[in-house]
């Protein structure tokens, strides 16, 4: 599959199942903590500055944003989790919306789960990974913000993350930086094998 990253549109921002796109394109969901760099990851992969809206305010993505990539697939931007300044009720609502999508959507082929390479995975990161493994959803684990860690320490940080998450070696692990473009090719290779 060849992807023309110049052909991009936003299909819909969906709050529930009845709003999901009706075509049968494969979907790759992107999940991670607020401010882990999801929008930057999408923009870097697609070589666009502001396609996915980046926000200085974490917790801005409150719907499932379906991005049409070259009329061939959707990237589905899932609301960032672990954002404290959102009411418990609001978080529960997001949780139900995310769970409904991840457990019932037949078009879903894999989830890009993003973690910050600088820190041990949070409880939310661990729960998300366990959830995806429980439902047998393929995971591409992406450690973002690699430019903030000296290259010589990448292996150490990778080991810490994998150990904390009880990483399944059948999943992909990619070190990524939207600043210096590390990991773009590896990310596309991992995504395309699920399509």
From Swiss-Prot:
It comes from the Bacteria. Residues 24-195 form the EngB-type G domain. Pfam families: MMR_HSR1. Its cofactor is Mg(2+). Keywords: Cell cycle, Cell division, GTP-binding, Magnesium, Metal-binding, Nucleotide-binding, Septation. One of its GO terms (cellular component) is cytosol. InterPro entries: G_ENGB_dom, GTP-bd, GTP-bd_ribosome_bio_YsxC, P-loop_NTPase. The keyword Metal-binding applies. GO terms for biological process: division septum assembly. Mg(2+) binds at residues 39, 61. GTP binds at residues 32-39, 59-63, 77-80, 144-147, 176-178. GO terms for molecular function: GTP binding; metal ion binding. Transmembrane segments: none annotated. Belongs to the TRAFAC class TrmE-Era-EngA-EngB-Septin-like GTPase superfamily. EngB GTPase family. Necessary for normal cell division and for the maintenance of normal septation. This is Probable GTP-binding protein EngB. The lineage of its organism: Bacteria, Bacillati, Bacillota, Bacilli, Lactobacillales. The gene is engB.
């Amino acid at each position: 599959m060849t992807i023309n990253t110049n052909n991009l549109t936003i299909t819909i921002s969906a709050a529930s199942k009845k709003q999901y796109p009706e075509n049968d394109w494969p979907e790759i969901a992107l999940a991670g903590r607020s401010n882990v760099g999801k929008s930057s990851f999408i923009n870097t992969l697609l070589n666009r500055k502001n396609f996915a809206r980046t926000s200085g305010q974490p917790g801005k993505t409150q719907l499932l944003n379906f991005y049409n990539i070259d009329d061939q697939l959707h990237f589905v931007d899932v609301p960032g989790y672990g954002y404290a300044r959102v009411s418990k009720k609001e978080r529960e609502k997001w949780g139900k919306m995310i769970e409904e999508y991840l457990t019932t959507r037949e078009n879903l082929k894999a989830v890009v789960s993003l973690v910050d390479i600088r820190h041990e995975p949070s409880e939310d990161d661990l729960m998300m990974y366990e959830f995806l493994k429980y439902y047998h959803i393929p995971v591409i684990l992406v450690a973002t913000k690699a430019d903030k860690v000296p290259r010589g320490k990448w292996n150490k940080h990778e080991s810490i993350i994998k150990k904390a998450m009880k990483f399944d070696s059948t999943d992909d692990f990619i070190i990524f930086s939207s600043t210096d473009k590390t990991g773009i090719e590896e990310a596309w290779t991992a995504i395309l094998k699920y399509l």
